[in-house]
Amino acid sequence: MFAELAPYLSNPRQTLAQLLNFALVLSTAFMGWKALSVYTNSSSPIVVVLSGSMEPAFQRGDLLFLWNNSPRAEVGEIVVYNVQGKDIPIVHRVIKAFGTGDGGKKSQRRLEREADKRSGPGLSSPVSHQMLTKGDNNIADDTELYAQGQDYLDRKLDIVGSVRGYIPAVGYVTIMLAENPWMKTVLLGIMGVMVMLQRE
C-alpha cells in the first residue's frame, strides 16, 4: 500500500490538491445538510429509528425524513422529539393533542418558563399546542420518558419534526458506527486513502 502512495508523497502539490478535494467533498456534504435543515425547519431532518418501539410501522434501522413546518401535530401523526437534557431522538405517535393551555396549569407554566428561557427577556414567547405520544409497540404512553414535571410535549419546544417518508434498514450503517466508534476511524481512513489514490 505504501508503494502505491509513494508517488503522491513525493509530489506535495498533488497531495495537497487531493486533500483539498477531500475537504471539498466534506464541506459540500455539510452545506447540503444545513440547506436541508433550513428547508425542513428541523435541526435533524433525517433520523434513524434506534429501537423497536414503533414496530410494525417502523423497524430499528429505518431512515426517516422529517418535516417541521406545520404549526400543529395531529392525533395519529408520527413525530420525532427530544427529551430535555438528553440528545436521543424518540420516534413515537401522537395519541392526544391539546390546544394552547388545555394541557393543564402545571404544564402550561413549565412551557411558559421554557419559552421565556429560549426567547430571552423582553421578547414574545407564545406557547404552542401540546401533545401526548406513545410507541405503537409500547403498552404505556410516554409520560415516564418526558422530563421531570412534564406532562405533555410542546410543539415548538420539543418536536424535531413529523415523519414524511422513510427508507427501510438503510440507517443500520449509522447504528453500527455509533455502537462501534473504531469503525468511524477506519471508514474515514479508507475514504482518505481512496481520495489520495484518485488520478487527476
Curated annotation (Swiss-Prot):
Disulfide bonds: none
Topological relation to the membrane, as annotated: Single-pass type II membrane protein
Lumenal compartment spans: 34-200
Gene Ontology biological process terms, A to Z: signal peptide processing
Keyword Nuclease carried by entry: no
Regions of this protein lying in the Cytoplasmic compartment: 1-15
Organism domain of life: Eukaryota
UniProt-annotated glycosylation sites, renumbered to this chain: 41
Region annotation C-terminal short (CTS) helix: where it falls in the sequence: 186-197
Catalytic site: 53, 92, 142
EC primary class: hydrolase
Record keyword Glycoprotein present: yes
A single GO cellular-component term on record: signal peptidase complex
Compartment(s) of residence: Endoplasmic reticulum membrane
Record keywords, A-Z: Endoplasmic reticulum, Glycoprotein, Hydrolase, Membrane, Protease, Signal-anchor, Transmembrane, Transmembrane helix
Matching PROSITE patterns: SPASE_I_1
Membrane-traversing stretches: 16-33
InterPro entries associated with the record: LexA/Signal_pep-like_sf (IPR036286), Pept_S26A_signal_pept_1_Ser-AS (IPR019756), Peptidase_S26 (IPR019533), Peptidase_S26B (IPR001733)
Quaternary context: Component of the signal peptidase complex (SPC) composed of a catalytic subunit SEC11 and three accessory subunits SPC1, SPC2 and SPC3. The complex induces a local thinning of the ER membrane which is used to measure the length of the signal peptide (SP) h-region of protein substrates. This ensures the selectivity of the complex towards h-regions shorter than 18-20 amino acids. SPC associates with the translocon complex.
UniProt domain comment: The C-terminal short (CTS) helix is essential for catalytic activity. It may be accommodated as a transmembrane helix in the thinned membrane environment of the complex, similarly to the signal peptide in the complex substrates.
NCBIfam families: sigpep_I_arch
Protein name: Signal peptidase complex catalytic subunit SEC11
Source organism of the structure: Arthroderma benhamiae (strain ATCC MYA-4681 / CBS 112371)
Name of the gene: SEC11
